[in-house]
Every structure is written in C-alpha cells, then in structure tokens.
C-alpha cells in the first residue's frame, strides 16, 4: 500500500504485500492486501482493499470496500459460559491436556462476519463475530461493532451506535438498485466523472434508468 497521494498500480490479479499472510481466501479483481495484514478463511470482492496490520478471519467482504489500518474483523471469542475461559480449555493439546475442543472451533467458525459493498471501515475498528455490515455503511475509527449495521448509515463509538444516515432511505434503495460495484471496469470508468461531480439525486436520476439492464451501460 502506497503513501498519501499515490497508490500501487493494481490489476485483475490480487495485489498482496509480501509481508501479508493470506491463507484459504478468495480475492476478486483489483483487490489489495497491505503490509502485515493477516487474512484467513475469508473472501473479498472486486475493488476492495485492506491496508496495514489488519486481522480478518471467517469474513465475507463485498466489492469496493475500504478497510483502514489496524482493523480486527471477527476476533476469536472465548467460552465465557464455562467455568474456565482460558485457551487451555479449547487448545488443550498445546498444554499437554489432551485433544483440542473441535466442537468449540466449529461453533466459532460458523459465526461469520458479513460485510456488504462499498463499506468504509475506519482505523482500529473491531467487528465482532456474527455481525452484518450493510452496503454503503461507514464505521468510524476505533469503533467496536457488536450489532448489525444498516445500509448507508454512519456508526461509531464503543459499542458502535448510529450517528447519522448518509442518504435518505429512498436514495439508499436507489443506490442498491443501481449497484455500481457490479459494473464492468469499462462501465465504471465511463461513469467516473459523474460519480465525482453529480449530486446524489442527479446521479440516481441518470443511472437508475440504466440499471434495468443489470449494469451501468447506456
């Protein structure tokens, strides 16, 4: 990941920093994984990127997502309902206590995090197990997200709470229908000037008509 004002040249082949650890993951086109990030048993859609020093496991990340430094997505839960919640209870083999608790790991693995499209996750965010982040949401820096986040809302704090909506419900519904993240590279490139310059209502008015074909082409 490059510094401010510049960026690596990406391609349809995922760009993974040599110091990153990516295991059993499915990465889309134009994706990037930054330095010292660990990503395991997860998927990430086209255009999305994860910057430095993030940990991600058992997570589905949509397209066009932006994940800032130090994010922790689906950190492991401990068995708080048991008399002892320490590692040794479920990682018993490491302590010479017998077999690991495979049922516990199956329970943990089943509790995926799901992140929609075009989501911005700020620096140092933690997203706990089982949470769904709606498309277009913004998660403020340092937030701890313990509940689902609605599409096109801004949340922040510990625990994360609603701060505001980015757009009205009708505008959000229109953007979900237009689904820019599903456009081809060519279509997206052609629309980029409008994305930069048009206000939200003008953008919706122009591109909602085109979305009936399932893409952003004229």
Language-model features and meaning:
Residues 12, 17, 86-127, 159-218:
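C-terminal segments of enzyme domains that contribute to small-molecule binding surfaces
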Residues 134-137, 150-152:
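Conserved catalytic segment of ABC-fold P-loop ATPases
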């Amino acid at each position: 990941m490059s510094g401010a004002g510049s960026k690596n040249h990406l391609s349809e082949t995922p760009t993974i920093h040599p110091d990153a650890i990516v295991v059993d993951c499915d990465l889309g086109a134009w994706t990037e994984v930054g330095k010292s990030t660990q990503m395991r048993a997860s998927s990430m859609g086209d255009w999305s990127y994860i910057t430095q020093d993030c940990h991600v496991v058992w997570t589905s990340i949509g397209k066009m997502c932006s994940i800032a430094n130090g994010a922790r997505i689906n950190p492991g839960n401990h068995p708080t309902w048991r008399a002892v919640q320490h590692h040794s209870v479920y990682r018993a083999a490491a302590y010479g206590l017998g077999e690991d608790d495979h049922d516990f790991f199956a329970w943990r693995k089943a509790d995926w995090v799901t992140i929609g499209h075009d989501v911005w996750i700020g620096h140092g965010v933690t997203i706990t197990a089982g949470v769904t982040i709606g498309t277009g949401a913004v998660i403020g820096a340092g937030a701890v997200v313990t509940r689902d986040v609605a599409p096109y809302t801004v949340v922040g704090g510990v625990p994360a709470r609603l701060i505001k909506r980015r757009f009205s419900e009708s505008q959000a519904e229109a953007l979900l229908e237009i689904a820019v993240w599903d456009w081809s590279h060519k279509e997206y490139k052609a629309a980029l000037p409008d994305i930069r310059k048009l206000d939200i209502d003008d953008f919706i008015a122009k591109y909602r008509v085109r979305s009936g074909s399932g893409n952003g082409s004229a």
